[in-house]
């Protein structure tokens, strides 16, 4: 169904995630060629901080400034809001200032993570 990037020896790019998740770009459409190697899906930012290493994409239904701050601390390049969630303009500006792409999809978390996994994107190692 989806291209298997890892089998072809290619990294996925943010623009590929947009197609896979039928997502809308919220901010930083100038960074859509950014490569991503791993992903994490969680609504608990404490879990992201405790168990995630070197992730590139964060999928979440949580919409508050803590999401951007957590993503920044974990050196993530892209935040995907699931279940049709939309951040406020203040949160969007926070991400823009930190060079983070924000996307939104109507898909649920489980479906979004599954589609990205099917396309070859994997989760990172836990501590």
Question: Where are the predicted features?
Answer:
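Feature captures the catalytic cores and cofactor-binding loops of soluble hydro-lyases/lyases
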Residues: 33-34, 38, 42-57, 61-127
């Amino acid at each position: 169904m989806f291209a298997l990037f890892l089998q072809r020896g290619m990294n996925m790019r943010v623009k590929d995630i947009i197609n896979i998740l039928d997502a809308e770009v919220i901010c930083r459409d100038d960074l859509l060629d950014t490569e991503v190697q791993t992903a994490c899906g969680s609504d608990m930012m404490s879990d992201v901080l405790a168990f995630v290493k070197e992730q590139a994409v964060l999928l979440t239904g949580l919409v508050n400034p803590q999401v951007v701050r957590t993503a920044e601390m974990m050196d993530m390049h892209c935040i995907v809001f699931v279940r049709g969630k939309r951040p406020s303009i203040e949160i969007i500006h926070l991400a823009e200032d930190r060079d983070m792409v924000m996307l939104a999809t109507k898909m649920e978390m489980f479906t979004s993570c599954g589609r990205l996994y099917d396309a070859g994107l994997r989760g990172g190692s836990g501590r």
